[in-house]
Every structure is written in structure tokens, then in C-alpha cells.
Regions:
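Short-chain dehydrogenase/reductase
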Residues: 75, 113, 131, 137, ...
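Beta-rich strand-turn-strand
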Residues: 116-131, 136-140
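Acidic, glycine-centered active-site loop in nucleotide-sugar glycosyltransferases
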Residues: 143-144, 150-152
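Flexible, glycine/small-residue-enriched loop-and-beta-strand segment within the central core
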Residues: 17, 35-50, 55-124, 151-153, ...
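Extended, small-residue-rich solenoid/repeat segments and analogous flexible loops
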Residues: 1-39
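Sparse recognition of residues in long alpha-helices and their boundaries
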Residues: 70, 128, 145-146
């Protein structure tokens, strides 16, 4: 019981710190909650807009140089990463870190469930009422009322019994 109380207190403290540090670059609706290790990285030109009743599970990261918009009633599994920018890499004679960034907004509609370890890349738009399965890398436009999942098959090979010879 004591741990639940402390966990709720820590969540409130994290929300207060977010609002104090980035109040001009972040907008958070009512009913917002998050667990431990959630990081919002917002550069001077960045902005994050979060609707009402949004929940972030442990260790999610949002990184903004442009704009990330999240609708109402969204839930995020553990380890979700959202980026509105990527490194430029046009000139082989210039180090990548000196070439700046390509920035495209990210938009997540209302009532979306983003599964654990999803990566959302610059320019992605996820329509309302969509579910993104665990481990998916999202880019481009996902229509509303969609379910997106990885189609990966496990390859299971048999280990043969017998003797082993190193030569």
C-alpha cells in the first residue's frame, strides 16, 4: 500500500517537473499519467502537444525538434520511442553530426494503443482508433481504425544429437 502511494507521488512530481522545465514547449491535457523513466527531450524549436487521458508506461522517450502531437485517450506500452527528426546524411565529406536534421511532424490520433518497443519515425501519422503492435517501426501514414503488427515468423531448427568433432 505504501509503495502505491509513493509511486503516485513520484508520478505527480515528474509531471510538475515537466511543466516547470518546458512549460512554453509542452502542452499536457487533463488525466495525464506516466510511469518511471519517461523522457521528453524538447529542443528550442520543438513542441509536444498531449491530449486528455494519455498514459505512458515505463521508459518511453519523445524527442522533438519540430512537433509531436498526441490525441486524447491514448496509451503507450513500455519503451516506445517517438522522433520528429532524423540526422541528415547527404555529404560524405562532412561528419553526420555536423549536417543538421531533417524535421517532420508526428501526429497520433485519438484513442490509439501503441504497443511496447514501438518506434515512431519523423513524418508518421497514425489515424484515430488504431493499434500498433509491439516492436513495429512506424513511418508514413496509418489510416484510422487500423491494426499494425510485425509479420515475423520464428525459424526453429533442430539440433541433431550425436558426437561432436572439432576437426
Amino acid at each position: 500500500m505504501c509503495f502505491r502511494f509513493l509511486d503516485k507521488c513520484m508520478g505527480l512530481i515528474r509531471m510538475i517537473l515537466i511543466r516547470l522545465k518546458n512549460s512554453d514547449r509542452i502542452s499536457i491535457g487533463s488525466g495525464f499519467s506516466l510511469r518511471k523513466g519517461v523522457i521528453f527531450r524538447i529542443k528550442k524549436t520543438g513542441r509536444i502537444i498531449i491530449g486528455n487521458n494519455v498514459f505512458f508506461n515505463n521508459y518511453c522517450t519523445l524527442s522533438s525538434i519540430g512537433e509531436i502531437t498526441i490525441g486524447n485517450d491514448c496509451i503507450f506500452g513500455e519503451g516506445v520511442r517517438i522522433y520528429d527528426h532524423n540526422h541528415r546524411y547527404c555529404c560524405s565529406n562532412i561528419p553526420i553530426y555536423e549536417q543538421g536534421y531533417k524535421v517532420k511532424p508526428v501526429i497520433i490520433g485519438d484513442n490509439c494503443w501503441i504497443g511496447s518497443n514501438v518506434v515512431i519515425l519523423p513524418g508518421a501519422t497514425i489515424g484515430d482508433n488504431s493499434v500498433i503492435g509491439a516492436g513495429v517501426v512506424v513511418y508514413g501514414r496509418i489510416p484510422e481504425d487500423s491494426v499494425v503488427k510485425n509479420i515475423q515468423e520464428l525459424q526453429i531448427d533442430k539440433i541433431e544429437r550425436g558426437s561432436y568433432s572439432a576437426h
